[in-house]
Amino acid sequence: MGAQFSKTAAKGEAAAERPGEAAVASSPSKANGQENGHVKVNGDASPAAAEPGAKEELQANGSAPAADKEEPASGGAATPAAADKDEAAAAPEPGAATADKEAAEAEPAEPGSPSAETEGASASSTSSPKAEDGAAPSPSSETPKKKKKRFSFKKSFKLSGFSFKKSKKEAGEGAEAEGATADGAKDEAAAAAGGDAAAAPGEQAGGAGAEGAEGGESREAEAAEPEQPEQPEQPAAEEPRAEEPSEAVGEKAEEPAPGATADDAPSAAGPEQEAPAATDEPAASAAPSASPEPQPECSPEAPPAPVAE
């Protein structure tokens, strides 16, 4: 830039004129809201502000530095005033950029423009998937109903399974109760078997006692028979002899029947009572023996008694 300052005086005059123009251009820009290089929202409506908009478009295309270089070549040597002008022109560019963006956004909003139609088509395309999505939820809304039904079915199945578990528990309790009853029945059967076994030895002992008593009676009868053929004159000698066999028979009856109970005791005492009865019979037979003719005994086995002297 220093080489450009050293050009001809004509160019210097032109540069001198440009600072005045820059001052004139800067004053309305400041009046429109540009202060210290900051642009307000409203931007510049002056023709000087429109030029920076064109420069911004060139910068947007990537040719803004070339335009800056062409201006010093065509306008001659650039002075510090021209540099200030360039800075002032570059400052309102952001405001113009925002205005252009707003205009570009506002243009598609027009209904007759093709861009609006394309946007409408895109909107319809986007809305159609939304509508399809809206239509899709209807099956999805149906499927939740099915799911709800399935869920209720699962609930019923779970409830049925729960009742089945209850039946299993009841069956288990019933099996335990049956096992307990079976055990009780086994215990009762074992107790009954033990009672039968205990009763069987008792019965056997009772039977042995009864047999012993019967044997004792038969032996007493046999002992009474030899007493009868004795002579009737010796009843006193016969009495102690009869008592002795009766005692021996009683002892023998007690020996074969050790398991006899107290009920068998009268049977043991019976022979003792029968023995005196047997002694009374020979005494009665002794009375008729005093007659001259002897009388034979009632028993056929007994031999005839000798004649008394």
Swiss-Prot record:
Region described as Calmodulin-binding (PSD): spans on this chain: 145-169
Classification via InterPro entries? MARCKS
Question: Which residues in this protein are found as N6-acetyllysine?
Answer: 165
Q: One Pfam family, short name please?
A: MARCKS
- Which UniProt keywords are given for this protein, alphabetically ordered? Acetylation, Actin-binding, Calmodulin-binding, Cell membrane, Cytoplasm, Cytoskeleton, Lipoprotein, Membrane, Myristate, Phosphoprotein
Where expressed (tissues)? Highest levels found in spleen and brain. Intermediate levels seen in thymus, ovary, lung and heart. Very low levels seen in kidney, skeletal muscle and liver.
Q: Where is the composition biased (Low complexity)?
A: 73-82, 89-98, 109-142, 190-203, 271-290
Q: Where is the lipid attached (N-myristoyl glycine)?
A: 2
Q: Which residues in this protein are found as Phosphothreonine?
A: 79, 143
Regions of compositional bias (Gly residues) in chain numbering? 204-215
Q: Where is this region: Disordered?
A: 1-309
Task: Give residue spans, biased composition: Polar residues.
Answer: 26-35
Mark out the compositionally biased spans (Pro residues): 291-309
| Compositionally skewed regions (Basic residues) per UniProt | 145-157
Which top-level group of life is the source organism from? Eukaryota
**Cellular compartment(s):** Cell membrane; Cytoplasm, Cytoskeleton; Cytoplasm
Q: Does the keyword Ribonucleoprotein apply?
A: no
PTM per UniProt? Acetylated at Lys-165 by KAT5; acetylation is required for its subsequent phosphorylation. Deacetylated by SIRT2. Phosphorylation by PKC displaces MARCKS from the membrane. It also inhibits the F-actin cross-linking activity.
The function of this protein is: Membrane-associated protein that plays a role in the structural modulation of the actin cytoskeleton, chemotaxis, motility, cell adhesion, phagocytosis, and exocytosis through lipid sequestering and/or protein docking to membranes. Thus, exerts an influence on a plethora of physiological processes, such as embryonic development, tissue regeneration, neuronal plasticity, and inflammation. Sequesters phosphatidylinositol 4,5-bisphosphate (PIP2) at lipid rafts in the plasma membrane of quiescent cells, an action reversed by protein kinase C, ultimately inhibiting exocytosis.
Q: How does it assemble?
A: Interacts with CDC42. Interacts with GTP-bound form of RAB10. Interacts with calmodulin/CALM1.
Q: Which family does it belong to?
A: Belongs to the MARCKS family.
Name recorded for this polypeptide: Myristoylated alanine-rich C-kinase substrate
What organism is listed for this UniProt entry?
Answer: Rattus norvegicus (Rat)
Phylogenetic placement of the source organism:
Eukaryota, Metazoa, Chordata, Craniata, Vertebrata
